[in-house]
Curated annotation (Swiss-Prot):
Protein name listed in UniProt: Uncharacterized protein C12orf42
The organism's taxonomic lineage, starting at the top: Eukaryota, Metazoa, Chordata, Craniata, Vertebrata
InterPro entries xref list: DUF4607 (IPR029288)
Biased composition (Polar residues): 202-212, 225-241
Segments passing through the bilayer: none
């Protein structure tokens, strides 16, 4: 009787401890109540004289075993197989089944192109290899380990940007901005002075450089010269360089001999002025205007002596023979040096074409 009383007390204590767990299992949807308030083991009442109380062994109840078997075969329990624990020894899974279960249950993480672990290692190695800033407190040199050197050798030196073939070709090409190529520079608008000035020679006056001979030959100037081969170059000063007194004296000279000046302007320029094209005759060659008051006897004798043995200059568009006696007489005589007024008149352009009717 004493053993039965002890068993009842133990059963009551066990039920008191199991009740909160049973309530939790009933509230959760994933669990099914496994046991009821019935006893979990068979209460065999052997004689006390054969088996003492402390030697009594508890055996699971047959109903509990059947219930657990049915529950393990249910689909709800199969959905809990990812926990990978055996319920009963007879239903244990073999090693291959466990491996398959682990392989199927693992999450598949997409692998990126650049591993973060390798990137962290490379950044750490670069940080170690970079020279530390020198300070008063930390002046110790950076110590490289053998492992870091071997890893750097295995990884290889990084390719730099200037090693590319495209940049090497750009470096090997000559610099066109510094090369002396007149055609290329003239196309870009850079003019080169072909008349190099010596170091000791001073700069000439602007009046002397105003002529076209002292100007650098550009592409535009060459085209204009090729179009007008018979044009004469005027070496006189421009209109902006004339003095006020000379500008006032120009109209007076023009009014004195208007026809002669106009005919000489046509012969000196080499091209007819205006829209109409007039053919140049040998008789229309220019004459140097001179008046009795402007003649200089000293200049006449010197020029006559210098030009006596010199051949007569020929224009590009003029013929080689001279049919007119008047032209031969004019060319044989030594004309005086043209005055400054003649240059100022030649530098001015006529407003309208003039017909030289008096020469025909």
């Amino acid at each position: 009787m004493s053993t039965v009383i002890c068993m009842k007390q133990r059963e009551e204590e066990f039920l008191l401890t199991i009740r909160p767990f049973a309530n939790r299992m009933q509230k959760s949807p994933c669990y099914i109540p496994i046991v009821s308030s019935a006893t979990l083991w068979d209460r065999s009442t052997p004689s006390a004289k054969h088996i003492p109380c402390y030697e009594r062994t508890s055996v699971p109840c047959s109903r509990f075993i059947n219930h657990m078997k049915n529950f393990s075969e249910s689909p709800k329990f199969r959905s809990l197989h990812f926990l990978n624990f055996p319920v009963f020894p007879e239903r244990t899974q073999n090693s291959m089944a466990c491996k398959r279960l682990l392989h199927t249950c693992q999450y598949i993480v997409p692998r990126c192109s650049v591993s973060t672990v390798s990137f962290d290692e490379e950044s750490y190695e670069e940080f170690r290899s970079s020279p530390a800033p020198s300070s008063e407190t930390d002046e110790a040199p950076l110590i490289f380990t053998a492992r870091g050197e071997t890893e750097e050798r295995a990884r290889g030196a990084p390719k730099q940007a200037w090693n590319s073939s495209f940049l090497e070709q750009l470096v090997k090409k000559p610099n066109w901005a510094h090369s002396v190529n007149p055609v290329h520079l003239e196309a870009q608008g850079i003019h080169i002075s072909r008349h190099t000035r010596p170091k000791g020679q001073p700069l000439s006056s602007p009046k002397k450089n105003s002529g076209s001979a002292a100007r650098p030959s550009t592409a535009i100037g060459l085209c204009r010269r090729s179009q007008t081969p018979g044009a004469l170059q005027s070496t006189g000063p421009s209109n902006t360089e004339l003095e006020p007194e000379e500008r006032m004296a120009v109209p007076a000279g023009a009014q004195a001999h208007p026809d002669d000046i106009q005919s000489r302007l046509l012969g000196a320029s080499g091209n007819p002025v205006g829209k109409g094209a007039v053919a140049m005759a040998p008789e229309m060659l220019p004459k140097h205007p001179h008046t009795p008051r402007d003649r200089r006897p000293q200049a006449d004798t010197s020029l006559h002596g210098n030009l006596a043995g010199a051949p007569l200059p020929l224009l590009a568009g003029a013929s080689t023979h001279f049919p007119s006696k008047r032209l031969i007489k004019v060319c044989s005589s030594a004309p005086p040096r043209p005055t400054r007024r003649f240059h100022t008149v030649c530098s001015q352009a006529l407003s309208r074409p003039v017909v030289n009717a008096h020469l025909h």
